[in-house]
Amino acid sequence: MVSGKRIADVGYRLFSGSMMLLTVYGGYLCVVRAQRYMQRKKQLELAAQSENTASEIIKE
């Protein structure tokens, strides 16, 4: 028969493992979001730069 201590140990390990996986997944989501933010920021800067260049050409 399985003792209560052994059941508690297994439960603790399962809980700890799931928390570890959630932490890793949360870190992954954070990195992906930061990467998308930086990519979007770069696209907006390039669009603004090309718009400024186009308006300078029109003025000439």
UniProtKB/Swiss-Prot annotation:
Repressor recorded as keyword: no
Membrane-crossing residue ranges in chain numbering: 10-32
Main location: mitochondrion
Membrane-protein topology: Single-pass membrane protein
Cell membrane keyword on record: no
Purpose of the protein: Plays a role in the assembly or stability of the cytochrome c oxidase complex (COX).
Protein name in the entry: Cytochrome c oxidase assembly protein COX14 homolog
Taxonomic lineage of the native organism: Eukaryota, Metazoa, Chordata, Craniata, Vertebrata
